[in-house]
Amino acid sequence: MSDVKRVDCLLIGRFQPFHLGHLEVVRKIAKECDELIIGIGSAQISHTFDNPFTAGERHLMISRALRADGIKDFFLVPIVDINQYGVWVSHVRSMVPPFERVYTNNPLTKRLFSEAGYEVSASPMFNRSQYSGTEIRKRMVEGDDWRKFVPNAVAEVIDSIDGVKRLRDLVQGGADAGD
């Protein structure tokens, strides 16, 4: 019987879209954890500039990118926003497999999970100025090169759903969260 403690980890993000910075974070965390649970945040929101892709589309992007990279020990779980911070950690816990450590750079997420007794670690940052979902979405709308910032599998999913046109239509139509 082994005395080595299992460490299962949770990473929550919107992944709009999943980019190479996210992939680097997952690679690093995967080395530190037995299993990685990836929570697809704001799962109920799509078809806005800030959140153009559905939870299912993001699930496909992430799973294909990770498998192509040889990462196999992960769970993907959509997490709907409930906008009640006092019970949010319980909500997340009810949606995902058990975990011991949370990776986040969001101050509120860090506080909520710390208060609930979880070990919280900062997510490593990789070239944040380039690997930003906002920047990648802007590049898509403006016709600039965006593909070099996402795994090939993600670009293929975006192409298959005509994601660039969707974003451009959203910008032309003025659709955004809260409109």
Please annotate each region the language model reported.
Residues M1-D179:
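Nucleotidyltransferase catalytic core that binds NTPs
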